[in-house]
Curated annotation (Swiss-Prot):
An individual GO BP term: defense response to fungus
Disulfide bridge positions per record: 33-81, 43-68, 52-77, 56-79
Any one annotated GO CC term: extracellular region
Residues annotated as signal peptide: 1-23
Name this polypeptide is given: Putative defensin-like protein 25
InterPro entries the UniProt entry points to: Defensin-like_20-28
Keyword terms of this UniProt record: Antimicrobial, Disulfide bond, Fungicide, Plant defense, Secreted, Signal
Localization annotation: Secreted
Similarity comment: family membership: Belongs to the DEFL family.
Top-rank taxon, per record: Eukaryota
C-alpha cells in the first residue's frame, strides 16, 4: 500500500512540473522579448509572476525576465526588452 502512495505522489509531481514545459519553446524561432504573451495564460498572482519570469528567461536571450502586465481583461505575461 505504501508503494502505491509513493507512486501516486511521484506521478503528481511529474505532472505538476511538466505543465510549464510546453511554454518554454519559442515558436517559429521568434523571440519572446518585448512582447505580451496571451498564450501563457493568466498572470495575476505571485506564483504566476514567477512562472512568467522563468518562461521569459528561457525564451528570451536578454536575460531580463518579465512582469505580469495589468490589462483590462486580466494580467498578461510580458517579457522585458
Amino acid at each position: 500500500m505504501a508503494s502505491l502512495k509513493v507512486f501516486s505522489f511521484a506521478l503528481i509531481l511529474v505532472l505538476t512540473f511538466s505543465v510549464d514545459v510546453e511554454g518554454y519553446n519559442v515558436e517559429s524561432g521568434g523571440s519572446l522579448c518585448c512582447n505580451n504573451h496571451p498564450k501563457f495564460g493568466k498572470c495575476n498572482t505571485n506564483n504566476d509572476n514567477q512562472r512568467c519570469n522563468r518562461w521569459c528567461h528561457n525564451g528570451c536571450g536578454n536575460g531580463k525576465g518579465d512582469y505580469c502586465k495589468a490589462m483590462s481583461h486580466g494580467g498578461l505575461c510580458h517579457c522585458y526588452c
